[in-house]
Amino acid sequence: MSEFLTPERTVYDSGVQFLRPKSLDEFIGQENVKKKLSLALEAAKMRGEVLDHVLLAGPPGLGKTTLAHIIASELQTNIHVTSGPVLVKQGDMAAILTSLERGDVLFIDEIHRLNKAVEELLYSAIEDFQIDIMIGKGPSAKSIRIDIQPFTLVGATTRSGLLSSPLRSRFGIILELDFYTVKELKEIIKRAASLMDVEIEDSAAEMIAKRSRGTPRIAIRLTKRVRDMLTVVKADRINTDIVLKTMEVLNIDAEGLDEFDRKILKTIIEIYRGGPVGLNALAASLGVEADTLSEVYEPYLLQAGFLARTPRGRVATEKAYKHLKYEVPENRLF
């Protein structure tokens, strides 16, 4: 996948912190999530209590990290940021937990990647605001219970199915983020352009939005590249011509597909006669890992209606045939 269209963080996402919304009012989209979160935040503040633990789940690039920072901002408290893969030993987690002050937010990204020992230490911290640590080794080792300050854990995951039941059940607030509409992305792009001190036409913002795969991170990334084109051609505002020139350079088509996306669909249509084809067979034909194909490439193709999953395998849809200008088989059932 093009580095410009991956929903994962890349080097092209540096220097965008100033574009992040600082409050729920500034946050565009995810209306149901915002309503639930706003209610919980307001109630916690009115009662003077620590906010319940929050799990933010959904595909990458939709704003989970931004929401974690907004939670801390709305509560006017500190946020401590870490991630599942970084917390290797119980001592790593204990050091963070014992440094928290009352009401602080502990944000753990990729929380589904916590190892079992660290996760188990977290259980009592979440539930009782206590941790048990072992002092010494062998027969003389003993467990010491330490009280910690009440805090709010905010966990983010792109794969909520990998969370253990004991961990998931300890979150009082579970919020599922979904892909954004073109209208929402258009507003995000216009806001970003304004903050970058760039004028953008409405039709140009919509053109970028349609290529952003329902993901704000991609929308911002593409807007930055369009701004580069604006600078090079020495124009005074972003219009549709400038957007089209940029997308041509980036090899991104009108549906937001790049060269490898099109290769996936062409492989299914040409080699496997439109499918169904199993994940492993398709991955082998494309020269990628099966997990990479299912987790990185497929979500947008499924969401946009170019690909369908059936009990027998992946199938290219009628939309895929038409987009790639293949003749749709007369006897084919989609």
Curated annotation (Swiss-Prot):
Homohexamer. Forms an RuvA(8)-RuvB(12)-Holliday junction (HJ) complex. HJ DNA is sandwiched between 2 RuvA tetramers; dsDNA enters through RuvA and exits via RuvB. An RuvB hexamer assembles on each DNA strand where it exits the tetramer. Each RuvB hexamer is contacted by two RuvA subunits (via domain III) on 2 adjacent RuvB subunits; this complex drives branch migration. In the full resolvosome a probable DNA-RuvA(4)-RuvB(12)-RuvC(2) complex forms which resolves the HJ. Its main location: cytoplasm. GO terms for molecular function: ATP binding; ATP hydrolysis activity; four-way junction DNA binding; four-way junction helicase activity. PANTHER family: HOLLIDAY JUNCTION BRANCH MIGRATION COMPLEX SUBUNIT RUVB, PTHR42848. The keyword Hydrolase applies. DNA binds at R309, R314. Residues 181-251 are annotated as: Small ATPAse domain (RuvB-S). It holds the Pfam family AAA_lid_4. The RuvA-RuvB-RuvC complex processes Holliday junction (HJ) DNA during genetic recombination and DNA repair, while the RuvA-RuvB complex plays an important role in the rescue of blocked DNA replication forks via replication fork reversal (RFR). RuvA specifically binds to HJ cruciform DNA, conferring on it an open structure. The RuvB hexamer acts as an ATP-dependent pump, pulling dsDNA into and through the RuvAB complex. RuvB forms 2 homohexamers on either side of HJ DNA bound by 1 or 2 RuvA tetramers; 4 subunits per hexamer contact DNA at a time. SMART domains: AAA. It catalyses: ATP + H2O = ADP + phosphate + H(+). This is Holliday junction branch migration complex subunit RuvB. One of its GO terms (cellular component) is Holliday junction resolvase complex. Signal peptide: none annotated. It is found in: Cytoplasm. It comes from the Bacteria. ATP binds at L19, R20, G61, K64, T65, T66, E127, D128, F129, R170, Y180, R217. Belongs to the RuvB family. Residues 1-180 are annotated as: Large ATPase domain (RuvB-L). Mg(2+) binds at T65. It is an enzyme of class 3 (hydrolase). Its EC number is 3.6.4.-.
